[in-house]
Amino acid sequence: MHEMSLAEGILKIALEYAEENEGQKVEEIGLIIGEMSGVVIDSLEFGFKMLAKGTIAEGAKLKVKEVPLRGRCTKCGEEMHVEHYDFWCPKCGDGVLEIVSGREMQVEYLEVE
């Protein structure tokens, strides 16, 4: 379950940020997670909740912005949402796509009091 190690990293970032800014409470953490990252959001939230107990991040909300998997055909330039990991271009039929988005996994913002 890599979600637990991700939750651990998110918590570390939040606590370090709060300490650097003399924060007393982490209220909200904004995350950007791509469709292709393989992250199970419910598992990530559960792991974070367990790890944050007893810290200033206990009760903090995780606000997740999910980014769709998008590709661009290297032959014709068509950009599309890639569904079910089907990497064939619907316009020209070529099978070589450049990933445009969907692999993101980052902390976008932190709200600390």
Model region roles, listed by residue range:
Residues E79-M80, V96:
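Cys/His-rich microdomains that often coordinate metals
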Residues G59-L69, P90-K91:
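Short, conserved loop-to-beta-strand elements that form functional interface hotspots
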Residues C73-C76, C89-C92:
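Short cysteine-rich clusters marking metal-coordination/redox-active sites
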Residues K91-E113:
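Short microdomains enriched in Cys/His and/or Lys/Arg
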